[in-house]
């Protein structure tokens, strides 16, 4: 008997099954199609077989870590939400997917990762509370820098020199995109009628994050909440496909009774790697900043350092 497919994704919060855009899209598509996945909702990407989230381990042991490729694999396994779409609807799907990535994705990244208030009070707060030590000290900041670089690439050569002008232009285009989605949806349950398709999985992931998070700076969120059919659309999908998971609170850092469970593969190995990486990062920072300098001294200090590392590892068990 073949092993079950396993999906590793970011855990949930803000009333959603996942706080990550890509993880939420893949989870939603899987629910739409009824794909039999063993889902691991985690807050440490190093516990993923690819080191990134989301990631799918297929029944043959192959690891896929790009959302579109994960969905393509599910289609090959005959879990295809677009099976009944016409050629015209397939073309519309591609057009709207391109629109989402070009007009809505940059502003979503800006809203959660670049806007100072939102990042400090919402995004960094959730990841810092959910991630294990010591990842919660440095990984949110690294993720923010990566999103800033991606946003610069998305803006491309048409980027205005004035940052305020760029932000105004991005948000204007995103509002127009939301309005267009609202007009296209109309009074339908889903974008192509009574059954969900892959487009619905991606649109929902964009809209639900924007709708559910309590953002102190929510210009685009306010525009979305004025489009009542899109808000009802998100609520319908949440209640129908995530009736229990959507109500979960952000996961606290817990110490499970049995650290070697099936839900946490390679836990011991990754705990040790996490602690060592954190200690190395803090030691490197101390050396580079001049807080600590290397001098010739007796080696009596080494046992104390080793004891500290063991104590931190014990706390992670």
From Swiss-Prot:
Q: Which Pfam families match?
A: GST_C_6, Tom37
Question: Which domain of life, per UniProt?
Answer: Eukaryota
Q: Could you list this entry's UniProt keywords, alphabetically sorted.
A: Isopeptide bond, Membrane, Mitochondrion, Mitochondrion outer membrane, Protein transport, Transmembrane, Transmembrane helix, Transport, Ubl conjugation
InterPro entries in UniProt? Glutathione-S-Trfase_C_sf (IPR036282), Glutathione_S-Trfase (IPR040079), Metaxin1/3 (IPR017410), Metaxin_GST (IPR033468), Mito_Protein_Transport_Metaxin (IPR050931), Sam37/metaxin_N (IPR019564)
What biological-process GO terms show up in the record? Answer: mitochondrion organization; protein transport
Gene3D superfamilies per the record?
A: 1.20.1050.10
What does UniProt give as GO cellular component? cytoplasm; SAM complex
Asked if the Swiss-Prot or TrEMBL record annotates the protein with the keyword Manganese, the reply is no
On whether Transmembrane is a keyword of this UniProt record, the answer is yes
Q: Mind telling me which residue stretches traverse the membrane in this protein? A: 164-184
What does the entry's PTM section describe? Ubiquitinated by PRKN during mitophagy, leading to its degradation and enhancement of mitophagy. Deubiquitinated by USP30.
Crosslink Glycyl lysine isopeptide (Lys-Gly) (interchain with G-Cter in ubiquitin): position given as 38, 41, 78
Q: Where in the cell is it found?
A: Mitochondrion outer membrane
Q: What is its main location?
A: mitochondrion
Similarity comment: family membership: Belongs to the metaxin family.
| Subunit structure and binding partners | Interacts with MTX2/metaxin-2. Associates with the mitochondrial contact site and cristae organizing system (MICOS) complex, composed of at least MICOS10/MIC10, CHCHD3/MIC19, CHCHD6/MIC25, APOOL/MIC27, IMMT/MIC60, APOO/MIC23/MIC26 and QIL1/MIC13. This complex was also known under the names MINOS or MitOS complex. The MICOS complex associates with mitochondrial outer membrane proteins SAMM50, MTX1 and MTX2 (together described as components of the mitochondrial outer membrane sorting assembly machinery (SAM) complex) and DNAJC11, mitochondrial inner membrane protein TMEM11 and with HSPA9.
What is this protein for, i.e. what is its function?
Answer: Involved in transport of proteins into the mitochondrion. Essential for embryonic development.
Protein name, UniProt field:
Metaxin-1
Q: Which lineage is the organism of this entry classified under, starting from the top rank?
A: Eukaryota, Metazoa, Chordata, Craniata, Vertebrata
């Amino acid at each position: 008997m073949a092993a079950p497919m396993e999906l590793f994704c970011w855990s949930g919060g803000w009333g959603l099954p996942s706080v990550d855009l890509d993880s939420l899209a893949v989870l939603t598509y899987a629910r739409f199609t009824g794909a039999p996945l063993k889902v691991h909702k985690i807050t440490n990407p190093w516990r993923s077989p690819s080191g990134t989230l989301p990631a799918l381990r297929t029944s043959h042991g192959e690891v896929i870590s790009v959302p579109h490729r994960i969905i393509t694999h599910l289609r090959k396994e005959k879990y295809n939400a677009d099976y009944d779409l016409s050629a015209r609807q397939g073309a519309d799907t591609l057009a709207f997917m391109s629109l989402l990535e070009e007009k809505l994705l940059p502003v979503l990244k800006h809203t959660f990762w670049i806007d100072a208030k939102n990042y400090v009070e919402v995004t960094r707060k959730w990841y810092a509370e959910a991630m294990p030590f010591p990842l919660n000290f440095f990984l949110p900041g690294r993720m923010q820098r990566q999103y800033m670089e991606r946003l610069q690439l998305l803006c491309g050569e048409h980027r205005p020199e004035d940052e305020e002008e760029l932000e105004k232009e991005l948000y204007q285009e995103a509002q127009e995109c939301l309005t267009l989605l609202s007009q296209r949806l109309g009074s339908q349950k889903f974008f192509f009628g009574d059954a969900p398709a892959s487009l619905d999985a991606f649109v929902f992931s964009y809209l639900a994050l924007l709708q559910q998070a309590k953002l102190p700076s929510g210009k685009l969120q306010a525009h979305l909440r004025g489009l009542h059919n899109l808000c009802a659309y998100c609520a319908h999908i949440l209640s129908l496909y995530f009736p229990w998971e959507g109500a979960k609170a952000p996961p606290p850092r817990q110490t499970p009774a049995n650290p070697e469970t099936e839900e946490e593969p390679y836990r011991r190995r990754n705990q040790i790697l996490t602690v060592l990486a954190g200690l190395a990062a803090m030691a490197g920072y101390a050396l580079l900043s001049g807080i600590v300098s290397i001098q010739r001294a007796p080696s009596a200090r080494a046992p104390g350092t080793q004891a500290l590392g063991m104590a931190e590892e014990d706390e992670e068990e």
